């Protein structure tokens, strides 16, 4: 656990010293997904994230990082970045080779997939907590705590054997310790400061209503869409008047391509109960001016067609009568 210097706390948290004062991400992690098809073929994908925002990719062909933002390097120099790329490049190649060499000993049947996540997060009081977890086929397998490999209960005896093997590589464990407890915290602080303008920026949400697939006879699925907001925390609810409507279902908050967020709130109601319902959106960027959209039954396509065709027919009829009268007057001697 690492404590932030007081000066940096003041920069990141001008309104207080808790993580809630920073309106943006508070953790960084890298994700590794290694797929093993057989004893000679493996593929690894990697990415780096600030909470749910991806800021790095990994080019497997060149063995280099892809920086998705101008400030994705944080305050690291080009030399430091190159050294880290070399560490990850050697690790990825060595990891695949070691897994394939020991797959038979650990009774791992092809094909299989190994997932890993490692990083550090900012907690209340200015503490930074580092973590590393590994999974096999989507199930917890092991973790690293205090520079020691800890097998997960779900991993059984296989995880215990793998941890015993890993702990024999003390040189590698020392590199892991340095990356987790020194490099990651320093990078996290630097990238949060470098990307502060983007990460703490506020974008007002846009909201609109639609109807979803009918849940059943005589029922409606009301959908309230909210998009384009930043930061991520948002409150959306269907309401009859000033009370929250029971049964409102919130989907996952999903990222947009421009680093804003999208959320939809749905409500299954009887068709006769939809009138008078509204969708209310609260967000810090609105400064108390909530968005309120009232539900009204959408105009049917048939009504739209009638609204266009009937006036057109009347116009044509009037033109025809005018033309016939004009012709009749011209025929009078």
From Swiss-Prot:
Cytoplasmic-facing ranges: 325-333
Membrane topology (UniProt): Single-pass type I membrane protein
Regions that span the bilayer: 304-324
Keywords (A to Z) from UniProt: Adaptive immunity, Cell membrane, Disulfide bond, Endosome, Glycoprotein, Immunity, Immunoglobulin domain, Lysosome, Membrane, Signal, Transmembrane, Transmembrane helix
Stretches assigned to the Ig-like domain: 185-295
InterPro entries cross-referenced by the UniProt entry: Ig-like_dom, Ig-like_dom_sf, Ig-like_fold, Ig_C1-set, MHC_class-I_related, MHC_I-like_Ag-recog, MHC_I-like_Ag-recog_sf, MHC_I/II-like_Ag-recog
Gene Ontology MF term list: endogenous lipid antigen binding; exogenous lipid antigen binding; lipopeptide binding
Record protein name field: T-cell surface glycoprotein CD1b
Organism from which the protein derives: Aotus nancymaae
Glycosylated residue positions: 38, 75, 146, 258
Signal sequence range: 1-18
Function: Antigen-presenting protein that binds self and non-self lipid and glycolipid antigens and presents them to T-cell receptors on natural killer T-cells.
Compartments, as annotated in UniProt: Cell membrane; Endosome membrane; Lysosome membrane
Sequence motif: Internalization signal, positions: 329-332
Principal location listed in the UniProt entry: membrane
Tissues and organs where the protein is expressed, per its UniProt entry: Expressed in lymphocytes, spleen, lung, liver, kidney and heart.
GO CC, one annotated term: external side of plasma membrane
Pfam families: C1-set, MHC_I_3
Extracellular side: 19-303
GO terms under biological process: adaptive immune response; antigen processing and presentation, endogenous lipid antigen via MHC class Ib; antigen processing and presentation, exogenous lipid antigen via MHC class Ib; positive regulation of T cell mediated cytotoxicity
Anything else known: During protein synthesis and maturation, CD1 family members bind endogenous lipids that are replaced by lipid or glycolipid antigens when the proteins are internalized and pass through endosomes or lysosomes, before trafficking back to the cell surface. Interaction with saposin C is required for the loading of bacterial lipid antigens onto CD1B in the lysosome.
Cysteines paired by S-S bonds: 120-184, 149-163, 224-279
Top-level lineage group: Eukaryota
Subunit field text: Heterodimer with B2M (beta-2-microglobulin). Interacts with saposin C.
